[in-house]
């Protein structure tokens, strides 16, 4: 096996006295966890002397459903509201930020609008082939000044987080460029994810509402990890 050592340097644009633009695509289980942690990173950056901090936008067209209230940070009062809007409103009220929510999908129609400047960092928290393809297309074309694409994903038995530099107007082809998820794991763009080997949220809700059985125990979902 051949190992390639790469020395990577953070682009100077992220160290300037301006806000670092971050776009999070997906506000579900993974996306909501990522978004709720970004205010702490923003505070840490400012504490260490970065004058701009983060300017975060969240994009997701889905609304909160009853099943989302089991494994995602939403409550019954959020049902019917847009996920991205709920999360951003909550963060802005608590932290005093002015972050933005876009209750839309990242598709070709959005990419051709051209009314938003390229984010410095795109964080993909999606679980479908179509969504990853849309992100890859965006960071190569419309968002052609994006520095990094961080992909966070999982399937039934594994997961990954990959920080890459998409080939675009800012990132050119060179040996030290960080490869993206589409280059390292092309199957994530070619194949659909398999459902996790645990009962779906809807099944849990149905069982609780039927009154025929006790709520499922979490221990029944556990799996031994390989050594």
State what each model feature region is.
Residues 2-30, 34, 129-227:
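Glycine-rich phosphate/adenylate-binding loop
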Residues 18-49, 57-65:
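Glycine-rich adenosine-cofactor-binding loop
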Residues 19, 53, 119:
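Phosphate-coordination loops involved in phosphoryl transfer and adenosine-cofactor binding
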Residues 41, 74-75, 139-142:
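Glycine-rich, phosphate-binding/catalytic loops in enzymes
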Residues 52-96:
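Glycine-rich phosphate-binding loop and adjoining beta1-alpha1-beta2 segment
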Residues 55, 98-100, 148:
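Conserved beta-strand segments of alpha/beta enzyme cores
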Residues 80-119, 126-133:
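A structured beta-alpha segment of the ubiquitous adenosine-cofactor-binding alpha/beta core
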Residues 122-125, 151:
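Redox-cofactor binding/interface segments in oxidoreductases and associated redox assembly factors
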């Amino acid at each position: 096996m051949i190992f390639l050592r790469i020395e990577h340097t953070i682009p100077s644009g992220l160290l300037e006295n301006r806000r670092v633009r971050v776009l999070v695509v997906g506000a579900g289980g993974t996306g909501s966890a990522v978004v709720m942690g970004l205010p702490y990173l923003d505070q840490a950056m400012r504490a260490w002397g970065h004058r701009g901090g983060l300017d975060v936008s969240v994009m997701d067209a889905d609304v909160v459903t009853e099943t989302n209230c089991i494994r995602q940070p939403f409550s019954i009062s959020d049902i019917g509201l847009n996920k991205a809007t709920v999360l951003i409103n909550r963060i802005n009220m608590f932290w005093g930020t002015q972050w933005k929510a876009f209750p839309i999908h990242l598709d070709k129609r959005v990419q051709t609008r051209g009314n938003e400047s390229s984010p410095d960092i795109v964080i993909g928290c999606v679980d479908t082939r179509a969504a990853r393809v849309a992100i890859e297309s965006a960071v190569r074309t419309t968002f052609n000044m994006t520095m990094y694409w961080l992909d966070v994903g999982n399937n039934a038995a594994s997961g990954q987080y990959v920080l890459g530099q998409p080939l675009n107007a800012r990132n050119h082809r060179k040996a030290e460029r960080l490869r993206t998820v589409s280059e390292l794991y092309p199957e994530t763009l070619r194949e659909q994810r398999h459902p996790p080997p645990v009962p779906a949220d809807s099944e849990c809700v149905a069982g609780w509402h039927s009154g025929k059985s006790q709520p499922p125990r979490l221990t029944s979902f556990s799996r031994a990890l390989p050594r």
